[in-house]
Amino acid sequence: MNLGKLVVSSSPHVHAELTTSKIMAWVLIALAPAGVMGVWYYGLRAFVVMVVCVAACVLSEYAWQKLTHRPLTIGDLSAAVTGLMLAYNLPVTIPLWMAAVGGVFAIIVVKQFYGGLGCNIVNPALAGRAMMLASWPVAMTTWTLDGVTTATPLALIKAGTLDQLPPLSHMLVGFMGGSLGETCKLALLIGFAILLWKKIITWHVPVIYILTVSVLCTLFGRGAPVADMLAGGLFLGAIFMATDYATSPITIKGKVIYAFGCGALTAVIRTWGGYPEGFTYAILVMNLTVPLIDRATKPRIFGEVKKHGK
């Protein structure tokens, strides 16, 4: 046991051989199938966007740590993971300079300003996407497939034109408009299986999050429960972003509460918000509640007497 490191999880503690760099390497491997399908559907431009985002994140982290005389951490691959996740949340037509700005913002403002890996209070890639949505809404919501501008399934559901939805089989394999890494649900499920196999994450947050969205969207009268699950970036957000170690709860009970909150907010934003998608802001809001959730769900120490009024 390394007594020089602070353990942030609740007891009991299980020690494993997985280091941060190994975990991030497996996350990159799990993300790879979605990236391959993004290039398959959108062409080499998708690969270029990925390279720009990853390079912007890695180089900005390197430059910041050099300027501030801090230990270099680009070898832990966390900046590369942030860059790839950001790229997956962007349309393939995004100007490359915007993608680079989003990567720099995610690393410098959201991650490094708060102390680096594990200290950020929200997911850096999602915060970068939120900043880009606020700054360049048109560029961030222009979708193409086979070079033709098209509406996303979520936009069709919100408009009530369910008869124009693509077949569910198309939505499962990704043949629809959307961000370059979010459309192929089969590829994302392969990544989910890899993360479960390596015990990088548990099933609780992704499954509860996705099912909550489907159930609540049905109760809210949207009329397409399966399409609501398969449309947009819900799978990408639930599997890879809502499960971020630094910004998600540490207990199973906390994960359940957190996942339900993410799902409820996503359903509310999709139904009544001005933007058809909702997972970005839902996860960011729930990230801010994680300290409260952890405090409320942390297991009581054996023999501890609960103080009056607490």
Each predicted region: which residue ranges?
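N-terminal signal-anchor module of multipass membrane proteins
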Residues: 1-54, 58, 303, 309
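C-terminal ends of transmembrane helices
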Residues: 11, 59-71, 107-118, 188-199, ...
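Alpha-helical transmembrane segments in multi-pass membrane proteins
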Residues: 26-34, 49-61, 78-83, 87, ...
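Structural signature of hydrophobic alpha-helical transmembrane segments
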Residues: 43-56, 93-102, 171, 175-185, ...
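Membrane-interface helix-loop-helix junctions at boundaries between adjacent transmembrane segments
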Residues: 78-79, 84-147
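Hydrophobic alpha-helical transmembrane segments in multi-pass integral membrane proteins
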Residues: 92, 138-144, 220-224, 264-279
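Long hydrophobic alpha-helical segments that form multi-pass transmembrane helix bundles
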Residues: 118-189
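Loop-to-transmembrane alpha-helix initiation sites
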Residues: 121, 125, 226-234, 255-257, ...
